[in-house]
A protein has these predicted regions:
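Residue patterns forming the tRNA-binding/recognition surfaces of aminoacyl-tRNA synthetases
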Residues: 1-31, 43-45, 90, 99, ...
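Protease-associated
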Residues: 35, 42-128, 137-141
């Protein structure tokens, strides 16, 4: 098992002073994000958080994600509205990275909106999953269903491409590689740093998982 940092990211809702909170275990895939996925039949809430932001996320995970923000005299959040996942389908958000918006335009495909699929679970994260169809089976499947653009900002060597602000950094260097060459730069911490500087990183919790190292 590998201990890594995941990311809970703020995606700005178009036309609203609010954000979708989405979780990913692979921050290096975020520049290739083209959609956010919710479970169609689960309940989602729009909440005013004590941190001053308005968030959309799954009702079942509110306390797990926002609970730690609670102050002595203030609850962590106040529920403003409640939705079914299907109510959020089609809602647009601002692309995290300009490169993905440009690539979607080039492919003449709609991107950066909410889609629905049953594979989204309420066991961890925020109940909203970031979708990059070039990476991951479920992402690829829902990408085909919604005809999302295929955006892949990682080359065959596993390096981030020049379109991104992380050109040349390794998307997923193995531990052995990192030890062998101290100059190998992993994209994950840099993506987290960049999002943090933009005020878009809500949290970067550590987690453990098994990771197959292959391209």
């Amino acid at each position: 098992t590998v201990k890594e940092r995941s990311a809970v990211v703020r995606f700005k809702v178009v036309g609203e002073d609010a954000y979708f909170l989405a979780w990913t275990t692979t921050p290096w895939t975020l520049p290739s994000n083209v959609a956010l996925c919710v479970n169609p039949s689960d309940t989602y809430c729009k909440v005013k958080s004590v941190d001053g932001y308005v968030y959309y996320m799954a009702e079942a995970l509110l306390d797990k994600v926002l609970g730690k923000l609670a102050e002595e005299d203030k609850p962590a959040y106040e529920v403003l509205e409640t939705y079914k996942g299907t109510d959020l389908e089609g809602k647009s958000y601002v692309a995290l990275y300009e490169c993905a918006a440009k690539e979607a335009e080039k492919q003449h495909k709609k991107a950066h909106y909410v889609i629905c699929d049953d594979y989204v679970t309420m066991s961890d994260g925020t109940g909203i999953v970031h979708i990059a169809p070039a990476f991951g089976e479920d992402d690829a499947r829902v990408g085909r269903e919604y005809d999302l653009p295929l955006v892949k900002f990682v080359d065959e060597k596993g390096c981030m491409t020049a379109e991104t602000p992380f050109a040349g950094m390794r998307a997923k260097p193995s531990k052995a590689e990192m030890e062998k060459d101290p100059n190998v730069k992993s994209a994950d911490p840099e993506v987290l740093k960049d999002l943090d500087a933009k005020g878009l990183l809500f949290d970067a919790p550590k987690f453990e998982h098994d990771y197959p190292h292959c391209w």
